[in-house]
Amino acid sequence: MKVLFINKFLDKEAIYRDPLGIMILAAVIRPKHKVFVIEPVREDVQKKMDEIQPDVIAYSLRTGYHRYYIDLNLKLKKKYKFVSIFGGPHVTFYPNVINEEGVDTICQGEADEAFAEFIDVLEQGGDITRVKNFWVKTQTGIIKNEKRPLNSNLDSIPFPDREIFDDYEEVCIAKVHSFIASRGCPFRCTYCFNDGMSKSYEGQKYVRRRSVDNVIKELKIVKEKYDLKIAIFEDDTFNLSRKWLKEFCEKFSKLNLKLLPIGVRAELIDEEQVQWLKKANCVSLIFGLESGNEKMRREVLFRNITDEKMIECARLLRKHGIGFATENILAIPTSTLDHDIETLALNLKCKPLYGGAKLMQPYPGTMMYNITVRMGLFKEKDFDVLTDFTASSNLEIDNRLERENLQRLFAIVIRFPFLFRHIRFLIKLRLKPLYAILHEIFKAYIGIKFMPYRRSLREYYVVFRRFIFSRESNIFFQMDGRNKDAICGSSSSIKETSVPKKELPVLLEDSQIVPKKYTKPLKSSQIADDVVATDFDSGER
């Protein structure tokens, strides 16, 4: 069968980040089927569709970008015949997507085995309504299948098929590529999808790791084929297992590569771990600071780590010459502008190379989603106008202008600390477009320092071109997070024609349990009582 993946993998937020999900799914089906990809913002979708004539089109949905793909799929359905498959985190936690016109099937949870089985059964003319993980829309209703058990042996999964992107210079010219060595996270942060995902697989081993040798083998292959210089690891908690980390660092150090893990837990870091990372030529890493207020971290975000531990982690990294960036969340429910400025102040004490700040977004499946709905701060319909969580928030928040300006100035103030004394004045100015431009320029500059290797002029040009053409998340479209035209991309040029369609009844059923919202706002102490954190087994330590 001809299977087409449509994905905006040239999104500027994903520069130097490979679309591993698509690559893995391509790897599991490519031995039997033909695989194609389309980047809908850069390419003429209609022309590519006419050339490929796919049997299946697959989309991976993230909350905030889901509407783009649903609308694009509907336009394609009016001109072409194919089976549409929607997967990804948004579908896993918000399966009512199946009710959307043009959506034929959804795939929930980890899709490696399920996707391959579905494509095989479809080609053979079998019963696709019996494939686990899939919900299928039929003439008589929606067939809902349970999820299959998690694959406990990650070494059995084929290496990501990077060759399907060889025609895209933006992906293959860089000497930086993404890898993942584990799946799952034992922590239960209220804003993270891992809490909801782990509960949906209750009773199973959610945190799993590839063997070190399996990871090293993949690294060697990519280094030989793509002249790899820096390996980015996208694990949720890269330093969870001390035993695994020590072995990995020892073997990685022999590859003559640079290491950049983007999911490090500060509370697990000690000097011994930092020494291992340094030996492995770790040039930079990212850890979540999230909030500069301990009570907010502990009671609202369920991040039980002290300011002192954050500062100590930063001190150890600086001592051993490892650059680092922090991730931060602004506009947390029950927080004030003062709390957000505390977050900036703690970053100034930690002195990261870059401090990324995002505005809180309540994603389906997270505890934060239930909290914000219950407080009346968020309505489900707001998902459809949510676009870029780095630029805006759909929560009902106080001091919106100041907080959105703070988000854009956050990293710049960390780099130029003298601005901190003027921050309250600066964030009151109606200069959001200017701040957005300054932030993106600064971010590009820091990115070069954060991933140090010798780039060719051609690579600089290609990366710049990728940045400019990422229209849906470009700074010029960040001025209004609800700009519908900005999300439509080149798909708007698709000409609609009438084709015979089956009349399929839609089952309107709420699969998302949403508590009743409170009539009064919750205090942070109430939230801690309202949502119970679960214990976890961190595995081999």
Regions found by a protein language model. Give the residues of each.
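A short, glycine/small-residue-rich beta-strand->loop->alpha-helix junction that serves as a flexible
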Residues: L10-L20, L61-H66
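Radical SAM enzyme core and accessory elements
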Residues: K2-I6, I15, K34, Q46-D50, ...
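Radical SAM [4Fe-4S] cluster-binding motif and immediate context
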Residues: D155, F159-A325, A345
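Short, solvent-exposed turn/loop segments enriched in Gly/Ser/Thr/Pro and often Arg
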Residues: R62, H90, E234-S241, V264-A266, ...
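Flexible glycine/acidic-rich beta-alpha junction loops that bind and position SAM and/or redox cofactors
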Residues: K12-E13, P95, F187, K295, ...
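Glycine-rich beta-alpha loop elements in corrinoid/cobalamin-binding modules
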Residues: K2, L25-L150, L359-G365, L504
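Glycine-enriched alpha-helix->loop->beta-strand junction motifs that scaffold or abut catalytic
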Residues: G102-V103, K278-S284, K351-P352
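Catalytic cores of alpha/beta
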Residues: P95-E100, T334-L348
